[in-house]
Regions:
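Extracellular glycan-interaction patches encoded by glycine-rich segments
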Residues: 1, 81, 133, 140, ...
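Extracytoplasmic low-complexity segments
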Residues: 1-74, 220-231
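Short surface loop/edge beta-strand patches of beta-sandwich-type extracellular domains
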Residues: 1-7, 71-92, 138-146, 192-196
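Extracellular glycan-recognition modules
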Residues: 26, 31, 35-44, 51, ...
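Short, aromatic/His-centered strand-loop micro-motif at the edge of beta-sheets
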Residues: 128-153
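Short strand-turn-strand beta-turns centered on an Asx-Gly dipeptide
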Residues: 137, 166-169
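Localized edge beta-strand/strand-to-loop motifs within extracellular or lumenal beta-rich domains
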Residues: 150-164
Length: 231
């Protein structure tokens, strides 16, 4: 298990990290949320806000690189089997390793009133329901080396004042930056569409969700907390 400096815990409502044996180990087909104890299973079908029936074969596998990460090779997806709440302010802070390719989901909350978050979609490397759109290069490059086959720390936030993205702990000016729908809700998806398609094929490290908009200092704190592990 990797142990590093503290991440931000104020407002933390969800956290998974394959570097923690309390969350996930080699051979597991589910992971355990380290904050509220929610089960996280292989995404299957389109459960909306009802009961999710997991597909164990669709859960990412354990990869020992970087102290332990979730490996989505071949296309995998996670369903959070619990209710993360309907919010008016939220943040997602995570380590991503994007494999080459066209559109893939980072997250999707549309099973229960949330919004999609896509990569390499409509000529943007990161696109949070068109409310926030960001490119690592200008013009858009689907194979941008700053994003593809490279570990990147990303924090996105939204509240009534708008949305922001931080890349490797630094604020990055994005297109639009209007407020998103901050709901996570029931059966929130990581790495797949709410109907289980266009799945992530790279890797993901630690993944943290908050019921607040992280500040610039807090986004930097989360990056610094584990940069020696991933970079």
């Amino acid at each position: 298990m990797y142990v590093g400096p503290d991440i931000v815990t104020d407002g933390l409502i969800f956290g998974i990290d394959a570097g923690s044996s309390r969350c996930f180990t080699s051979g597991d087909t589910t992971a355990t949320d380290l904050v509220q104890g929610f089960n996280c299973s292989g995404a299957n079908g389109n459960p909306m806000s009802g009961t999710h029936t997991p597909n164990t074969a669709n859960f990412p596998v354990y990869n020992a690189t970087k102290g332990g990460v979730f490996d989505f090779a071949g296309g995998k997806g996670i369903n959070v089997d619990g209710d993360l709440g309907n919010l008016t302010t939220s943040s997602m802070s995570m380590w991503l390793y994007r494999a080459p390719g066209a559109t893939q989901y980072v997250t999707d909350g549309r099973n229960d009133s949330g919004q999609w978050f896509l990569s390499n979609y409509t000529s943007f490397n990161l696109n949070w329901h068109n409310t926030l759109r960001y490119n690592f290069e200008d013009p858009y490059n689907v194979s941008a080396p700053e994003f593809i086959n490279k570990w990147v720390h990303m924090t996105i936030t939204s509240d009534s004042t708008g949305s922001k993205v931080y890349i490797n702990g630094v604020y990055a000016a994005a297109t639009n930056e209007s407020s998103a729908d901050e709901d996570f809700g029931v059966n929130f998806r990581i790495g797949t569409r709410y109907t289980t398609s266009s799945q992530w094929t790279g890797k993901m490290g630690s993944i943290y969700f908050y019921d607040k908009a992280l500040s610039a200092a807090e986004a930097l704190q989360n990056y610094n907390a584990q940069k020696s592990r991933f970079l």
